[in-house]
Regions:
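Small-residue-rich segments of transmembrane alpha-helices in multi-pass membrane proteins
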Residues: 79-91
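Short, charged juxtamembrane terminal tails flanking transmembrane helices
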Residues: 133-138
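Membrane-interface helix termini and inter-helical loops of multi-pass transporters
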Residues: 37-42, 98-108
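N-terminal signal-anchor transmembrane alpha-helix
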Residues: 1-39
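Generic alpha-helical transmembrane segments
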Residues: 47-64, 87
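Hydrophobic alpha-helical transmembrane segments in multi-pass integral membrane proteins
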Residues: 29-32, 88-103
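Hydrophobic residues within the alpha-helical transmembrane core of Major Facilitator Superfamily
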Residues: 27-31, 58, 126
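Canonical alpha-helical transmembrane segments
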Residues: 57-71, 127-128
């Protein structure tokens, strides 16, 4: 994060939210260890890693977008939405055409990772659009 693009409030909010996301990650790692030791594998390693990364990331991105701390002074919402939609398409389309089933024997397979990542990018674009609507209503 380059500090010259963010004001003091945005920097403080980003630090606070990143601390929260880190705490969520710690709790999820402990919960993952308990689930794996009690019930066995619930997902293959790549899908498990993606889930453990995406949940705190979704928290951080959503809260920072709606707190107006995600983008710097020079960033454009439309440009961000465009690029996140492009990334979503680049991850989601191949996951349906090139890879196998994302769920097998009641567990996530490694082929779910690109699909989950694409959904994450789609979520970021939707959060940006929702924040624009929220600003227009205010």
């Amino acid at each position: 994060m380059r500090h010259e693009h963010y004001d003091e409030r945005q920097t403080f909010v980003n630090y606070k939210l990143s601390h929260h996301a880190l705490m969520i990650l710690f709790v999820m790692l402990v919960a993952n260890a308990l689930v794996k030791s009690t019930f066995g594998l619930w997902a293959e390693p790549m899908a498990e890693t993606i889930i453990l990364i995406l949940v705190p990331s979704i928290y951080y991105v959503t809260r920072s977008i709606f707190a107006d701390a995600y983008m710097g002074r020079r960033d454009s919402v439309r440009k961000n939405v465009f690029w996140f939609l492009i990334l979503a398409v680049l991850f989601i389309v191949p996951s349906f055409t090139l890879y196998g089933d994302p769920i097998f024997d009641s567990g996530l397979t490694d082929t779910a990772a690109p699909l989950l990542t694409g959904i994450f990018f789609l979520f970021i674009a939707a959060a940006h659009i929702a924040s624009l609507w929220k600003k227009d209503d205010a």
